[in-house]
Regions:
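Short acidic low-complexity segments
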Residues: 58-69
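Sec-dependent bacterial lipoprotein signal peptides
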Residues: 1-15
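Sec/Tat-exported extracytoplasmic proteins
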Residues: 53-57, 105-109, 153-162
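A structural "domain/chain start" motif
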Residues: 16-58, 161-163
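Soluble non-cytosolic domains of exported or imported proteins
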Residues: 39-47, 92-96, 136-149
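Surface-exposed short loop/turn segments
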Residues: 72-118, 122-137
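Short coil/turn motifs at beta-sheet boundaries
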Residues: 28-30, 66, 90-96
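C-terminal/domain-edge helix-coil "capping" segments
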Residues: 130-163
Length: 163
């Protein structure tokens, strides 16, 4: 009986502090009622941004002359740079994975509200040749996480310029 109360109290404390599992957040309301998204070489980001905006209540439409705002995403690139090398073996110990994407927002007259702004997010991870498969999976997971982070930044930026 006491264990049940202790478990209930622990769950209440955990939820009260704002903890939630990554990827389970419910998107907050967006300031944009309607938005067109044009993707020029940024398919992963465009899909994620569209999804986050729709969860926030934004209707995604096709770009046209009547569209009030158009978000253009370009040049989605992942870079993997060496962060550290082992002094003994000369082999890579750490990498830094960076995602860059260019964004711009225009109004209904084609006037830029946000003009060619680059959003970048980086994460580093250790590399071990003895577990290449595991590290490959870790890199894939990091790439997905970077896409979510950049997309969230873009949504926040779009919200900020449409207040």
């Amino acid at each position: 009986m006491h264990l049940r109360y202790l478990l209930l109290l622990s769950l209440l404390a955990l939820s009260a502090c704002g903890f939630h599992l990554r990827g389970t957040q419910v998107a907050s309301r967006t300031n944009v009622s309607e938005l067109a998204i044009k993707s020029v070489s940024a398919p992963l980001i465009a899909e994620q941004v569209s999804s986050q905006l729709q969860l926030g209540g934004t209707r995604i439409v096709e770009p046209s002359d009547k569209t009030r705002r158009v978000l253009t995403l370009r040049n989605e690139t992942f870079d993997r740079d060496v962060l550290s090398v082992s002094a003994d073996t000369g082999k890579v110990k750490e990498y830094q994975l960076t995602l860059h994407v260019d964004m711009s927002v225009t109004d209904s007259k084609g006037k830029p509200v946000v003009d060619n702004e680059t959003i970048s997010v980086s994460r580093d991870y250790t590399f071990d040749e003895s577990s290449i498969l595991g590290k490959s999976n870790e890199e894939t997971s990091l790439r997905e996480d970077l896409v979510r982070q950049v997309s969230a930044q873009i949504v926040r930026r779009v919200n900020a310029v449409t207040k």
